């Protein structure tokens, strides 16, 4: 597939030809990365076609978050990132499959069915932005937008062999993003390479008065300033890879060796055990999800239950029929931790621990430029692999720290396991220092020259 950098130099006629080619490929593909052929929606404007995750509002398109409960809901306005794309010669072209309401790590919970990993169709593409990553890796999209709440851009990028960037919280407007966890959610790019990630990130970044959490900063110019010659002080976290598979640990060590040979300084630092971060993340995210999803009741928009006798039954049937099992589980757990008698023991304590984690990251970044970790404990696994939801939650162990602290992080493919499956590694930077993430990744990408096709 042509890269984003290359596509931006095409004429409008050439772009129309490209869109027709993408549409034909999507119709012929069995990955189920798109919800439907992109031509059925049409493009949101003239420009380079960008795949959009199904939780980002595109005016006039049916946006469902891959959930039955939003069946028939047509977005009445553009998300701010869509307006930004249009101003930068890009346009939405197709909606990507995802875990329902972005709650999952495998893209198995979508009402549209599972998405397959293009590297091995018997395996998951990761999630929740699995459709975006599978499409980019499978040659079905030039580039894509995803959302990242606890690793939902970076983990599927790692599983599929793409570059995935989660920007600093507030760097990219969330206006028009259908919320899962408002204090963690962030929109970001999934692309074929670091240059494309930089270009797409620059296009969607910047202050937005419609988002109260938006940082008052101008759009970034990371692509213009990409520098592969910078050298950084990079921290690795002690005992941090003990939960990773042997293949991931080997890729981690080999990448560290490459970074040292490139002239970067590697130092060891210690943080709170990552298993605590899992507990903190899920308590807070489920609590916020239970609040955010309370609006989906069958009254104002989306699916409405039939043959009901009163308002209470309308609420109960619409929500029980419309939500999938994982979403129901998180809503129930979220309501539990917010309930009387449990708020202080769970939610309040989790928020206090979140502050401690942010302070630990800030302390580390007083002495280093970047932190280096795996993205996921394993490469992509087979479908129906997790015996319990808890096992799936643990797959986020390396990614959630950046969301808890609001820091930017990037997933870069660095190796292949013995089965030929991609393995990604992650860089985390201090707040609003996406430039360093992209610089070090750009240099490492060229140094490794990993061929995944």
From Swiss-Prot:
Query: Listed disulfide bonds for this chain?
Result: none
Instruction: List the Pfam families.
Output: Amidase (PF01425)
Out of the domains of life, which is the source? Answer: Bacteria
Which cellular component, as a GO term, is one annotated location? glutamyl-tRNA(Gln) amidotransferase complex
Q: Which GO terms describe its molecular function?
A: ATP binding; glutaminyl-tRNA synthase (glutamine-hydrolyzing) activity
Listed under catalytic activity are: L-glutamyl-tRNA(Gln) + L-glutamine + ATP + H2O = L-glutaminyl-tRNA(Gln) + L-glutamate + ADP + phosphate + H(+)
Alphabetical UniProt keywords = ATP-binding, Ligase, Nucleotide-binding, Protein biosynthesis
Q: Which GO terms describe its biological process?
A: translation
What positions does UniProt annotate as the active site of this protein?
53, 128, 152
Question: In the Enzyme Commission scheme, what number(s) does this protein have?
Answer: 6.3.5.7
Oligomer and partners: Heterotrimer of A, B and C subunits.
The protein's job, in short, is: Allows the formation of correctly charged Gln-tRNA(Gln) through the transamidation of misacylated Glu-tRNA(Gln) in organisms which lack glutaminyl-tRNA synthetase. The reaction takes place in the presence of glutamine and ATP through an activated gamma-phospho-Glu-tRNA(Gln).
Q: Which family does it belong to?
A: Belongs to the amidase family. GatA subfamily.
Q: What is this protein called?
A: Glutamyl-tRNA(Gln) amidotransferase subunit A
Organism equals: Helicobacter pylori (strain ATCC 700392 / 26695)
Q: Lineage from the top down?
A: Bacteria, Pseudomonadati, Campylobacterota, Epsilonproteobacteria, Campylobacterales
